[in-house]
Amino acid sequence: MNVPAPPLRLAEAAGVLSLATDLAMGQPLEHGLRTAVLALRTARAMGLSEDEQVTVYYTGLLHFAGCTAESEIDARFFGNEMAARPRMMTVARGSRLELVATAMRTAHAGSAPLARAAMMARAAFGGIAEFRKWAASHCDVARLLGSRMGLSGPVQQALRHLYERWDGNGMPGELRGAQLPLAVRLMQVAQDADVACQYGGPALAAGTLTRRAGSGLDPDAVRIFLSLGDAPYKGLDAPSIWDDAMDAEPGPQPVAAGARLDECLSAMADFADLKSIQRLYRKTGLSTRAGATLFAPSTGSSGGQASDLCRRAR
């Protein structure tokens, strides 16, 4: 008897992906979940509509969704990308001086002096172009992933502008101020707050957000977040907030089933393979071959069995 695969909540799929991106970006597990919850609590305090809250929630979960696309650039620029990423996260929306100084201290740390000197010369002449390429590839992959997962147009639009800044000095530098989607502005405040909390709790987060208000961050979003005191952080120090993050999803809680589920899983598989260009579409190809084998006349297998094996292969 064939039992069809149960539908999958899109929030669960996005949540699983956010856990993977936490690891890929060198962040503590559930950073993405905490970012989504912090941003959503701010959105609710602002009285945003349910649809707007949905966009904020999924933007928070998937703000690292394009991280595998930048691996090659990160490795070329920094050497040890996994050591560099968490350090760069602490200054991503800081001042230009903070960003450049941290990049110089981090890039190819431990290498011979001549090698580091060559890297610094290259960074001085091509660093900005490299980072623009980095941001564009990350955002393009994130938007495409959101599309293939069946997320709404506003979510996909937000995922295109993850690395823009309030002052217009972000990447790729196309938007500034209120031109940035509100979901992105709230996500950025929440992300910076969570990263700072890892090092010094809400007090350090408040100082960090205050310094960046009006430059890297939306000053109104910072003001509203800080006006809530410690309330946004309530319960986020638990060993795991998975259940709370899933329960927090606003709106009708959409699911993926059948062909939509297959496309969602294929998108997640391609995301994983993008870490290495040599492995691109490997998981998708594996699942296709698995299905072809099961559909061979000699196997006598049903379509349901083939679909199940394809999902397992991904």
Sequence positions of predicted segments:
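Histidine- and acidic-residue-rich, metal-dependent catalytic cores
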Residues: 2-314
